[in-house]
Curated annotation (Swiss-Prot):
NCBIfam families assigned: PRK12855.1, PRK12856.1
InterPro entries: UPF0145_dom_sf (IPR035439), UPF0145_YbjQ-like (IPR002765)
Family classification: Belongs to the UPF0145 family.
A Pfam family that the UniProt record links to this protein: YbjQ_1
UniProt xrefs under PANTHER family: UPF0145 PROTEIN YBJQ (PTHR34068:SF1)
Name of the featured protein: UPF0145 protein BCE_1095
Cross-referenced Gene3D superfamilies: Hypothetical protein apc22750. Chain B (3.30.110.70)
HAMAP family: UPF0145 (MF_00338)
Amino acid sequence: MIVTTTSGIQGKEIIEYIDIVNGEAIMGANIVRDLFASVRDVVGGRAGSYESKLKEARDIAMDEMKELAKQKGANAIVGIDVDYEVVRDGMLMVAVSGTAVRI
């Protein structure tokens, strides 16, 4: 499945706009543990433990969105948007959305 942030796919014609699709993932984060992990892992300004959690949550949300698009008969998703929110008690939510299309 082709997934893109752009509104179209170069060299491909969108035959049908099917529906808006989305996916969400909420990951629990122990603030104290993550704070110490960040201090320990910071190399070149990057916190490896936190980045790993972000990637895991993003992958789960993207997979959920792709599966929904596939169930609706789409073979591509255009206009992808990825949002990150910290919700109560230090939990992280990743929400992705886009338009399921058939090319």
